[in-house]
Amino acid sequence: MLSVVIAPGQGAPVFTRNAQVPHYAASTMKAAVLAALYRSDLDWDARVPVVNRFRSRTGSVYGNDRAEDSDPLPWERLGEQVPLRWLAERMVSHSSNLATNLCLQQVGHPAVAEVWRRAGAKGGSPRGIEDAAARKAGVNNLVSALDLARLLQSLEPEVLALLEHNTHRVDLAAGLPPGVRLAGKNGWITGVRLSAALVHPDDAPPYVLSVCYTGPLAGGRDVEDPAARLLARISRGVWQRRHTIAAAGR
């Protein structure tokens, strides 16, 4: 299943394909956690204990698997205290699962749910990363391409600026010329590859591209993934038509 949404930076989509079909959110939910942190009254300079013990939505306790995390740095700080700001940055720049659950533990699930609601999303992310007990109980993080597009359009400039630091640039970013600014978040597990970004061409207005793929091309690797190459091809094609997006949205 391939879902695509193309829209101006602010405005209704100009192209949709399976736009409201739900996909497993994977790490795209980290953008919503970041927005919830930004909109909270939490002190980003406060120091947070780095632990690997979290409360499941079922009431049990779970932890993250270090081998499944794309960012080793937060794991090296286990038992220490680090600034919340650093965790928020690692969550979106290197897609740290451990940092995500630590941030989620600070801000709370209701605040993240409010981010999705304000964006106009039908889906959301009601549980943390690797909360297997909640997943077995039917609590799933599901989003559509339209949900992700609306989320990006709802974000404050400061949140988008942090999303520009995403270092995983093998899908939508790989389809753009070098140096093109984009703010977004991607996610991948076996069977799923998603990516949504606000792209800033120098010669055209900003546009949002959101692509969700569920199927056999998604091998679950952060690099050398056929599904990532598919998303890059889509991104390249949209880039070539970037001058028509704003006009089509009027």
Predicted regions and their residues:
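Mid-domain, small-residue-enriched loop/turn segments at the edges of structured enzyme/sensor domains
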Residues: 1-2, 80-84, 94-152
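Short pre-catalytic segments that frame enzyme active sites
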Residues: 1-24, 39-41
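Structured C-terminal helix/loop/strand segments within mature extracytoplasmic catalytic/sensor domains
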Residues: 10-14, 22, 106-108, 156-170, ...
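Second-shell loop/turn segments in exported
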Residues: 16-23, 73-78, 86-90, 98-104, ...
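Active-site SXXK
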Residues: 24-50, 91, 209
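Short glycine/serine- and small hydrophobic-enriched flexible loop segments
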Residues: 35-42, 105, 150-156, 236-240
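A conserved catalytic-loop motif detector
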Residues: 137-178
